[in-house]
Every structure is written in structure tokens, then in C-alpha cells.
Amino acid sequence: MKITTLGRGSIGGTLARLWTKAGHEVTMFGRDGGDASDADVVLVAVPSGVVPDALTRVTGLDGKVVLDATNRMTATPPAGYPSIAEYLKAQTGGPTAKVFNLNFGALLEQAAQTSPKPGNIWVGDEAARAAVEKLTRDIGMEPLHGGSLELASVQEAFAVMLMGIVGDRDEGLLYYRFASPQTF
């Protein structure tokens, strides 16, 4: 799969390395942008407050599968949109998913060696499912579909709560897993 990541930081950079290792062709853009025309999938992993500006610097986004890994810890979605993911869909017109925003970049590289497999909650368009599930499994995680893109604002809010859980624990960062009892 040809993937463009918009963002080279903890999430974007780590996923790019893992996907390259899994055999995907990955191009990384910083906030300066570039041309994503050749991409099958575009990962948006920049700070939420710069999403609108960053998008103006990327061409070739029309109709692409867009994976939104942003979190709006302090920023609000662009005016008129309940979530950043829905804003991204409106700008690109392609299948969109809110995904990889509930994971910690520092732990992503360890996911493949973790048992049971950590979960990766996502919401989004059905047309994005194949890409989301393949790219999630390719890094050693289990995709957990939570519903349609209209739930992206709920997932964004959950990210804030997850940061509270992490901040309240002495152990630091964490994986999460939802599974039937017989899988543990």
C-alpha cells in the first residue's frame, strides 16, 4: 500500500517506520506538505490546531482514504464541524477514519511483541475499513471498530479521558484491550 503521513512526530514517524518494515511504501511530510497524489492512504498526525493550515500545503488529497490520528486536547474542531475527522472528510471527500489517536507513540513499536495483542479503537466510514484493519494488524495490534464517523467527536473526547487515566497511574503509558474472557 502507498501511504503518505502528514506528520513526522511520535505517531506519524513511528507508524511510518512500522509500515515501511511491514512492506508498505511510505512518504512522510512535515507541516510544509507536499503532493499526496500517489498515495492510497493519507495519515494525518499533526497537532490538531494546525490541521487546517497543514492541509492547505498538501495537494492530491481528493478522494483519498484519510486516517485521522489527531487529538484536540486544547483545540476545538474547525468551525461548523463536530470533530477534526469530519472536517478532514469534508476537505478531502474520501473515506475517513478516526484511528491511532488513542495509542502512545512510545508503545507502538512494542505492540507486535505484546500478548494479548493491544487494541486499536477506530470509528469511520465503512469504505476505510480494509485499510484501517490491514494497517492496524500490520503493526501487531487488533482493530476495534466502534461505529461510524459521526462518533469521531466521542473518540476525540475519550482521548482526553485516556490522558487522565495515564496521568493518574504510577505505571505510566498503557495499552488497552477489549476481548472475550477466553482470549486472556
Predicted stretch roles:
Residues 70-113:
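Rossmann-fold NAD(P)-binding glycine/threonine-rich loop
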